[in-house]
């Protein structure tokens, strides 16, 4: 990845990190998960850092330092697109979603396979999914996040890049809050911290996506 792109990917993450320091894949139709993030008090520094992280509007277009990196990305994109075809039949829509997810997950320091697994469990890859708790979109982001760290417009959570950006930033926040403990962070993301059912579902889904070339 080029220096400029890498700087953009890492710069926003450093801001909120600094603040926080004080088998084969089977895609099945699932209802949106009923669990949801819980609104918790945020220190002003954390709120500001998270707001800066979601506000950066750099386009999700990857740049690579070498031909090998670019070829690896293209192989991943092709394999992921093929696996996602049953859920997203239109090729341009599928590719745009995957390109955006790859960018936003890498930007937040997350594995694309983990984010794909979370989206699979949370929404079944449905852009306009709404849970019983009111969580929205691919990553089932609760509307209060738009008020806490966004511009207050919760309808934007149905926009692909906005939803994936918020979801990735929130998961990164929970990971940092839990000292890197993925099970606890995933539980917190779903509003079921300390229980294993939801994290195990996400990690199981991640294994399928991790097998991509």
Predicted regions and their residues:
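Catalytic glycan-binding domains that act on GlcNAc-containing polysaccharides
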Residues: 56-213
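N-terminal secretory signal peptides and thylakoid transit peptides that target proteins
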Residues: 2-24
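C-terminal segment of N-terminal export signals and the immediately downstream linker at the start
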Residues: 9-12, 27-48, 52
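Sterically constrained small-residue positions within well-ordered secondary structures
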Residues: 25-27, 132
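Charged, low-complexity surface segments at secondary-structure and domain boundaries
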Residues: 5, 34, 61-65
């Amino acid at each position: 990845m080029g220096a400029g792109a890498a700087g953009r990917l890492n710069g926003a993450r450093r801001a909120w990190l600094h603040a926080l320091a004080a088998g084969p894949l089977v895609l099945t139709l699932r209802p949106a998960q009923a669990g949801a993030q819980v609104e918790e008090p945020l220190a002003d520094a954390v709120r500001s850092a998270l707001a800066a992280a979601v506000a950066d509007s750099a386009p999700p277009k990857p740049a690579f330092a070498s031909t090998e990196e670019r070829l690896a990305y293209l192989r991943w994109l092709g394999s992921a697109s093929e696996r996602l075809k049953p859920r997203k039949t239109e090729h341009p829509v599928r590719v745009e979603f995957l390109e955006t997810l790859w960018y936003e997950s890498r930007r937040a320091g997350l594995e694309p396979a983990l984010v794909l697994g979370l989206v699979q469990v949370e929404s079944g890859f449905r852009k306009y999914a709404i849970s019983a708790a009111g969580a929205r979109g691919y990553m089932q982001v609760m509307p209060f996040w738009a008020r806490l760290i966004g511009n207050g417009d919760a309808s934007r959570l149905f926009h692909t890049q906005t939803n994936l950006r918020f979801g990735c930033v929130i998961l990164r926040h929970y990971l940092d809050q839990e000292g890197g403990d993925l099970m606890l962070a995933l539980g917190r993301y779903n509003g079921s911290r300390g229980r294993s059912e939801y994290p195990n579902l996400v990690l199981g889904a991640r294994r399928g996506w991790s097998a991509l070339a």
